[in-house]
């Protein structure tokens, strides 16, 4: 069954190996960082011949989806649920950053189900040898666990096996009515509907990812359909997210500046109605007129599009960025604005939380990566280095400072950004260097001219939005590396335990394995000469119990 | 074309801006370069207002000699005084005058919109300066008082001792002119020589997959003068290696940015169109200004778009923002477009692409004080 489906999809171009890389002339297959070399491991793409661009171009977003063993849904066992996407981190706050509590040693990755042994052996040579056995390798057992990349291109959703060298998707789902624009996955979804899909028409679907993988057709199966034909809101879905710990609740942002809250157990068929928006310039929340219908609430955020939303890992805060250039942070339960501020100029395109919920990254049309502090309720640093708009930002929650002593005093964050300049940039945020000087008394810091810092010296009250800061007031960061990773403008970035995943707007995805520093740790397990290069993929299951501590995740929004 | 007009009216409905007119321009054989630029200038509100003011105050002068500016003023006045809200106008007199006056634009060949804009603005400046000189000498002979503002909204520079030496500042200067400062630092004696120059628009080199912000940064990046290209330092009295950088000393009220999409390729012996994807934000701040202009914000209000894969053929259209609506002008056709549609004119990240509609001249208006 699966073979049929796979054969169809992968037929035209499955023979190209990632290293051959025909579409990326002049692009290196590695980049160097202080901690070592990141190497291009796999590429994922789609057969564009199958696509018809009738609906116009879309921008690819990528979601990482971790399917757990079906037999044991209740126990969060060894499956490294760490790299799920934006949601489902009930114990996320338990993880402290920068304490270096063994996260380096944890390099387990769940190979995908029944295909594991096959893919493992092929993986060793996979990067460089032409693959001539793709059909046998794609015989993956979708009942088992696995890690998948879900991405949208034009009118289709594609699903790839993250840990397979196969370039082509294992599954494609075509939408006849409209283009999928955004998606999200919850590994802990209770009733099996774990994947959310938002469409250009405003329609929203929830489905079971496993059910899609098991089905041979190119249609969405077993879907629950909300906002049918845009009956509640017919503007484009821009960003979608599960509410962490929200018991199946999810939030959909639209291009008209509204976002809607859905509850899973409510009826999608009954149409919700909302009162007219009183003042389009003001934030307002309205409940649906009938309590049994979905969506249950409408939040009018701003004029112009909401471009991206992200929940803090504990689900307490919701960040939104939009066309008006404002980052807004809301308390999700009380539905109140906590704080926010404007970009230097232009729209903001993406946002992402640090694991501890203390910082938010944004990227936008001013070519800057902004670091927003929740403690200070203001921008604490600008990352300068992109030559075009910043389209994806993410903290690397698996990274720990090499010189961190666990005291929490020198917590350093690593984060990444991708832009329409086709570059991936990595940054280090050292608290000593950035935040502490800013808290000094006026004139106390030799780096800043006196008298300039109204922005920095005032305590910013709750519930207010900050205007764009003056250029000279904001400390600047420089990237530790800048690497051109694709030929096309990029649209997304995420960190997994063993890799960095980059995606371009046209739907090509590259998976860069982390430097093999952890190879020393993994040498104890079945040392194979070649395993050093790919060590992260091989570590044995017996370490898996440890990895359950690491509830990581990278929000991945365009 | 009346049908198209009413379609636009329907699309705007009761949101049709009071007193505003949206008229397409007839094409007289490859005059789209002219049409697209004229639309952008018409929706450059300070320019339109000044020109219409000039028109009204000069109408009484019966024997006024026809020139390019009177033809333009006449055209703008024709549009603004139309009874209908939408429709088509033939800018016949203007085009005839243009062709009569400059042989460059006489042929039916494809013309460069930027060259035309440049020519037009300089021509208007010349005419205003000539008139100002005439008025000035008149004033000087009749009375020696130096009025701050004289007819036609023409401003004479503030009296700070050098009034008579200063070049005449016309309203075109007040709208479009900025000042660049060219700082050269001799690497031997460290002396910085600054030389100011004025500009009506900035021509920027472009790179693949970059932004206007980045192109502006490159424009102001430090360049080292060495080897054949050394700098004559007045202090050292000899040719020296030096570092040079351009900064914007005074940002203009209306910032016109020309993307150098037509590049001479030596190996080919001809010009080639660069279809690079260069993104331009709807709001912009200049990174390369000197204080106190560092955080002046600009808002995009018009884009002249070149359509086509080569420099010698193709088409020009323009995108215009008027009263918070974006409009698409393609000769006689006018349509409303979504703001997000502006993004489809950024260019292509692949060399050979079916998308050949590329932003070529950008018009930004300052939202803050630039004076």
Curated annotation (Swiss-Prot), chain B:
Keyword Nucleus: yes
Main location: nucleus
Gene Ontology terms: cellular component: nucleus
CDD domains on file: Peptidase_C19G (cd02663)
Compartments, record wording: Nucleus
Keyword terms, alphabetized: Hydrolase, Lipoprotein, Myristate, Nucleus, Protease, Thiol protease, Ubl conjugation pathway
One example GO MF annotation: cysteine-type deubiquitinase activity
USP domain segment(s): 23-367
Superkingdom in the source lineage: Eukaryota
Enzyme Commission code: 3.4.19.12
Reported tissue expression: Constitutively and ubiquitously expressed.
Reactions catalysed, as given in the entry: Thiol-dependent hydrolysis of ester, thioester, amide, peptide and isopeptide bonds formed by the C-terminal Gly of ubiquitin (a 76-residue protein attached to proteins as an intracellular targeting signal)
GO biological process entries: protein deubiquitination; proteolysis
Outcome recorded upon mutating residue 32 to S: Loss of activity
Motif (Bipartite nuclear localization signal): 83-100
Lipidation (N-myristoyl glycine): 2
InterPro entries: Papain-like_cys_pep_sf (IPR038765), Peptidase_C19 (IPR050164), Peptidase_C19_UCH (IPR001394), USP_CS (IPR018200), USP_dom (IPR028889)
Pfam families named in the record: UCH
Catalytic EC class: hydrolase
Active site: 32 (nucleophile), 315 (proton acceptor)
Described purpose of this protein according to its UniProt entry: Recognizes and hydrolyzes the peptide bond at the C-terminal Gly of ubiquitin. Involved in the processing of poly-ubiquitin precursors as well as that of ubiquitinated proteins. Required for the correct development of pollen.
UniProt record similarity statement: Belongs to the peptidase C19 family.
The protein, known as: Ubiquitin carboxyl-terminal hydrolase 3
Origin species: Arabidopsis thaliana (Mouse-ear cress)
Gene name, Swiss-Prot/TrEMBL: UBP3
């Amino acid at each position: 069954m699966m073979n049929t489906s796979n054969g169809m999809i992968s037929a035209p171009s499955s023979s190209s190996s990632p290293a051959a890389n025909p579409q990326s002339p002049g692009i290196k297959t590695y980049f160097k960082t202080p901690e070592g070399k990141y190497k291009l491991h796999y590429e994922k793409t789609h057969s564009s011949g199958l696509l018809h661009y009738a609906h116009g171009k879309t921008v690819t977003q990528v979601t990482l989806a971790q399917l757990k063993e079906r037999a044991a849904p209740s126990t969060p066992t060894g499956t490294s649920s760490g790299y799920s996407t934006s949601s489902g981190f009930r114990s996320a706050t338990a993880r402290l950053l920068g304490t270096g509590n063994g996260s380096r040693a944890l390099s387990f990755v769940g190979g995908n189900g029944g295909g594991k042994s096959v893919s493992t052996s092929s993986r060793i040579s996979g990067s460089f040898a032409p693959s001539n056995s793709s059909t046998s390798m794609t015989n993956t057992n979708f009942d088992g666990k696995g890690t998948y990349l879900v991405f949208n291109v034009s009118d289709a959703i594609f699903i790839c096996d993250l840990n397979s060298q196969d370039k082509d998707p294992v599954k494609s789902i075509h939408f006849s009515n409209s283009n999928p624009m955004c998606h999200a996955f919850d590994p802990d979804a209770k009733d099996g509907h774990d994947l959310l899909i938002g469409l250009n028409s405003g329609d929203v679907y929830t489905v079971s990812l496993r059910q899609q993988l098991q089905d041979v057709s190119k249609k969405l199966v077993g879907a629950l359909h909300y906002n049918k034909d845009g009956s509640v809101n017919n503007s484009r879905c821009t960003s979608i997210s599960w509410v962490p710990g929200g018991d199946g609740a999810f939030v959909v942002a639209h291009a008209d500046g509204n976002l809607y809250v859905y509850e899973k157990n409510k009826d999608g068929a009954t149409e919700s109605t909302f009162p007219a928006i009183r003042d389009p310039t003001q934030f307002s929340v309205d409940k649906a007129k009938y309590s049994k219908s979905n969506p249950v609430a409408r939040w009018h955020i701003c004029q112009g599009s909401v471009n991206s939303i992200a929940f803090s890992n504990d689900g307490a805060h919701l960040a939104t960025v939009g066309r008006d250039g404002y980052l807004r942070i809301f308390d999700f339960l009380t539905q109140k604005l906590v704080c926010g501020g404007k970009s230097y100029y232009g729209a903001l395109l993406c946002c992402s939380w640090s694991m501890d919920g203390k910082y938010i990254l944004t990227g936008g049309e001013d070519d800057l990566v902004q670091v927003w502090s929740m403690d200070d309720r203001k921008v604490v640093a600008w990352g300068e280095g992109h030559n075009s708009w910043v389209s994806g930002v993410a903290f690397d929650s698996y990274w720990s400072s090499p010189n961190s002593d666990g005291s929490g005093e020198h917590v350093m964050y690593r984060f990444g950004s991708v832009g329409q300049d086709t570059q991936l940039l990595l940054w280090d945020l050292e608290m000593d260097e950035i935040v502490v000087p800013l808290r000094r008394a006026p004139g106390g810091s030799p780096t800043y001219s006196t008298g300039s810092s109204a922005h920095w010296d005032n305590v910013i009250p709750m519930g207010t939005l900050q205007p764009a800061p003056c250029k000279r007031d904001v400390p600047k960061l420089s990237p530790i590396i800048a690497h051109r990773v694709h030929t096309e403008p990029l649209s997304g970035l995420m960190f997994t335990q063993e890799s960095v995943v980059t995606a371009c707007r046209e739907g090509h995805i590259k998976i860069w394995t982390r430097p093999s520093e952890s190879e020393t740790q993994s040498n104890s397990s079945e040392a194979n000469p070649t395993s050093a290069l790919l060590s992260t993929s091989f570590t044995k299951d017996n370490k898996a119990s440890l990895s359950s501590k690491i509830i990581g995740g990278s929000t991945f929004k365009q | 074309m009346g049908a198209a007009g009413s379609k636009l009216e329907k699309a705007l409905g009761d949101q049709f801006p009071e007193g505003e007119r949206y008229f397409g321009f007839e094409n007289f054989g490859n005059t789209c370069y002219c049409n697209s630029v004229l639309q952008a200038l018409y929706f450059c509100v300070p320019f339109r207002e000044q020109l219409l003011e000039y028109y009204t105050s000069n109408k009484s002068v019966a024997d006024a000699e026809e020139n390019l500016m009177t033809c333009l003023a006449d055209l703008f006045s024709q549009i603004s005084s139309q009874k209908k809200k939408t429709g088509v106008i033939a800018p016949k007199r203007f085009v005839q005058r243009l062709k009569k006056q400059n042989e460059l634009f006489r042929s039916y060949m494809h013309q460069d919109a930027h060259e035309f804009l440049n020519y037009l603005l300089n021509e208007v400046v010349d005419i205003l300066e000539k008139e100002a000189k005439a008025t000035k000498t008149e004033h000087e002979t009749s009375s020696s008082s130096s009025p701050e503002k004289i007819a036609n909204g023409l401003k004479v520079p503030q009296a700070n001792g050098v009034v008579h030496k200063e070049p005449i500042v016309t309203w075109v200067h007040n709208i479009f002119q900025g000042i660049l400062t060219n700082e050269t630092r001799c690497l031997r004696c460290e002396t910085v020589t600054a030389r100011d120059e004025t500009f009506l628009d900035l021509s920027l080199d472009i790179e693949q997959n970059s932004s206007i912000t980045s192109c502006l940064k490159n424009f102001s990046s430090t360049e080292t003068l060495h080897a054949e290209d050394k700098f004559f330092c007045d202090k050292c009295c000899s040719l020296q290696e030096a570092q040079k950088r351009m900064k914007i000393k005074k940002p203009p009220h209306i910032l016109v940015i020309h993307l150098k999409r037509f590049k001479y390729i030596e190996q080919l012996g001809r010009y080639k169109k660069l279809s690079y994807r260069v993104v331009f934000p709807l709001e912009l701040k200049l990174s390369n200004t000197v204080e106190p202009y560092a955080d002046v914000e600009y808002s995009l209000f018009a884009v002249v778009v070149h359509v086509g894969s080569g420099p010698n053929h193709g088409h020009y259209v323009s995108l215009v923002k008027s009263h918070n609506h974006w409009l698409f002008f393609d000769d006689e056709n006018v349509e409303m477009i979504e703001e997000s549609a502006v993004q489809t004119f950024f260019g292509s990240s692949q060399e050979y692409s079916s998308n050949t509609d590329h932003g070529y001249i950008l018009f930004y208006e300052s939202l803050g004080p630039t004076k």
